[in-house]
Swiss-Prot record:
NCBIfam families from the UniProt entry: MalateDH-SF1, PRK05442.1
A GO term, aspect molecular function: L-malate dehydrogenase (NAD+) activity
Source organism of this protein record: Acidovorax ebreus (strain TPSY)
Superkingdom of the organism of origin: Bacteria
InterPro entries, per the entry: L-lactate/malate_DH, Lactate/malate_DH_C, Lactate/malate_DH_N, Lactate_DH/Glyco_Ohase_4_C, Malate_DH_type2, NAD(P)-bd_dom_sf
GO biological process: malate metabolic process; tricarboxylic acid cycle
Sorted UniProt keywords: NAD, Oxidoreductase, Tricarboxylic acid cycle
UniProt protein name: Malate dehydrogenase
Residues that bind substrate: R95, R101, N134, R165
Catalytic residues of the enzyme: H190 (proton acceptor)
EC numbers, comma separated: 1.1.1.37
Primary role: Catalyzes the reversible oxidation of malate to oxaloacetate.
Coiled-coil residues: none
């Protein structure tokens, strides 16, 4: 028996990441090759953006995806999020020249407060929300706080791009196949302060840390390379990473919806006090997923260097949160 279509809302749908994302969702890469989807696409109510969205929709139609059961164009989150089962919040205000961080936080607080309220009002009560637009953790926190009738655990931020970047760097350093690396995680904020942690990682059951055995490389090369990878891509391409961000969003949602089969993945999720992270902060943790639920991997030893890295990324997140509290 064929499955009933699910509703997937995507914001910033005509942007670079949206363009790299939508065709893959429509082809079944995110929710499975047997799951029809209805795309509910949101763009700002600006004529240029809405026209660009029309063009993307024409292309989606021209792919004749068997799983694409419907496409809607919206300029208002109250209609875009109606009954949605999955919401990928990609659109955010980018940092412009001369813009202070406080201005960026305030501009995004406005967007994500409105979107959180709309999700609260009209989305499915089991909606799974992934915030991709930066600052992703804080934007997820704002949306979550603006949706008091939805479970806090339904709001997540994307750390999977950092996770995938870290896996790729480790594979290159150790001569591993990237798909063989297990038990890697990224702690904290999706920002250069994130802490990519391979102390528990294995390849074919053997320790990656022992194989690499180079703490100076970890501290001076690996962590800065992963942390500043986004900036390096902007410098090289003149545009921010779009296809890799879309790919990470697909990975995050696919694992959340369909299960990680016991493997660790990284998600930014609201803390319940695990690892000393204050409750409610949206923080990158190692998780496993099954039956549409994620579970934080608990009981991992945190050494002095790791604690220092976790404290640093936590301090940054608390600073961001303090910067938006008066706006909520």
């Amino acid at each position: 028996m064929s499955k009933k279509p699910v509703r997937v809302a995507v914001t910033g749908a005509a942007g670079q990441i949206g363009y790299a994302l939508l065709f893959r969702i429509a082809s079944g890469e995110m929710l499975g090759k047997d799951q029809p989807v209805i795309l509910q696409l949101l763009e700002i109510p600006d004529e240029k953006a809405q026209n660009a969205l029309k063009g993307v929709i024409m292309e989606l139609e021209d792919c004749a995806f068997p799983l694409l059961a419907g496409i809607e164009a919206h300029s208002d989150p109250m209609t875009a999020f109606k009954d949605t089962d999955y919401a990928l919040l990609v659109g955010a205000r980018p940092r412009g020249p001369g813009m202070e961080r406080a201005d960026l936080l305030a501009a995004n607080a406005q967007i994500f407060t409105a979107q959180g309220k709309a999700l609260n009002a009209v989305a499915s009560r089991n909606v799974k929300v992934l915030v991709v637009g930066n600052p992703a953790n804080t934007n997820a926190y704002i949306a979550m706080k603006s949706a008091p009738d939805l479970p806090a655990k339904n709001f997540t931020a994307m750390l999977r791009l950092d996770h995938n970047r870290a896996a790729s760097q480790l594979a290159a350093k150790g001569g591993f196949k990237v798909g063989d690396i297990k038990k890697l995680t990224v702690w904290g904020n999706h920002s250069p302060t994130m802490y990519a942690d391979y102390r528990f990682a294995t390849v074919d059951g053997k320790s990656v840390k022992d194989a690499i055995n180079d703490q100076a490389w970890n501290k001076d090369v690996f962590l800065p390379t992963v942390g500043k990878r986004g900036a390096a891509i902007i410098a090289a391409r003149g545009l921010s990473s779009a296809a890799s961000a879309a790919n990470a969003a697909i990975d995050h949602m696919r694992d959340w919806a369909l299960g990680s089969k016991g493997e660790w993945v990284t998600m930014g999720v609201p803390s319940n006090g695990e690892y000393g992270i204050p409750a409610g902060i949206v923080f990158g943790f190692p998780v496993t997923t099954e039956n549409g639920e994620y579970k934080i991997v608990e009981g991992l030893a945190i050494d002095a260097f790791s604690q220092e890295c976790i404290d640093k990324t936590l301090a940054e997140l608390q600073g961001e949160q303090d910067g938006v509290k008066h706006l909520l």
